[in-house]
Amino acid sequence: ETANACALDRCIMHCADNFHWADKYPVRDMGNGKVRAAGMALAMQGSCISNVDVGSCTLKLSDCGTYNMMIGAADMGTGCDTILAQMAAEVLDCEPDDITVFGADTDASPYDSGSYASSTTYITGMATQNAALELRENIKKIGAQLLGCDASEVDFDGKEVYIINPDGADNGAVSVSLSDIATKAQVNNTIPVDVTATYSSPVSPPPYMVGMVEIELDKETGAVKILDYQAVVDCGIPVNPNLARVQTEGGIGQGIGMALYENVTYNAGGKIAENDLMQYKIPTRQDVGNINVEFETSYEPSGPFGVKSIGEIVINTPAPALAHAIYRATGVWHRTVPFTPEKILMGMADPNWHEKDLRVK
């Protein structure tokens, strides 16, 4: 596939400027056995599984002039209900509050492959856009009937259908309200005001991310403290920048947990040793340092409103960026997560150490 939208070069420069890479990259001796170093990583991901993922959306004009939207995607905290409502509202020239979203119900919802593979905004978003465009055209057709003219002569501004050039209108009226159209849709009408659109993409355009991290490493204990993490993401056009930002911040936190803390080991009986949160360590807010997230935009022509995905890419850069920073601080590459203090000390003590198996036997 050819990447039609890529702002990775701008992401690198933006990230380096905000992070002050030139100042933080040199290894600095802080005394007491502690050094500071910086690392960076680049990542790309997909926006769906091309030719596999399917998303659908049903939009219905209610009798009070608002809309109901039914989707098969489940909002698991990613904010897809909000984002898809925003997309429909943009096409229908209304407020997102005018759209009531009904989430996944296998008995009633249109089919969706699922909220996975970073595909909801890209795949179900396109289905939502297409459904909204079709419903908009049907609203114009019903409005044109009430105005006694052809649908090509009217437009819709979200509140009423109006004649673009009112001269010569048969019944003298130049506009009809959305509520009147909703009422007309229930009487002697053959134009549907509930439409379903389904979409699957032949391509999977990649979003991009740059992550830069500054650490302080204690050479006497192997402990790593994160000071700053700067991220710049190209996810196409961010439909909801606030949701995109917190999605990125959360993913960075998860990536830091994977890189430094989280591990699964098995005892001799085959049972997981870390079977509760007392043993399975995840980072808290004080463990992730200062996180700053910015965006560089690109327009993806195959996505709704130019979007690409952001779901999974945000977890990809912390581990390699931290590995780079630890290498800068110690001269040893670590390739198996988590990068625990024990592994870091072993690596500094034995240059030929290759991360021997530390699992419980």
Residue spans for each PLM region:
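Conserved beta-alpha junction segments in alpha/beta enzyme cores
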Residues: A38-T66, I71, T78
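Short, contiguous strand/loop micro-motifs
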Residues: I71-D75, S309-I310
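Generic recognition of short, well-ordered alpha-helical segments
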Residues: R10, V54, T82-I83
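C-terminal catalytic domains of large/alpha subunits in multi-subunit enzymes
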Residues: E1-A41, Q45, M87-K361
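Thiamine diphosphate
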Residues: C80-A88
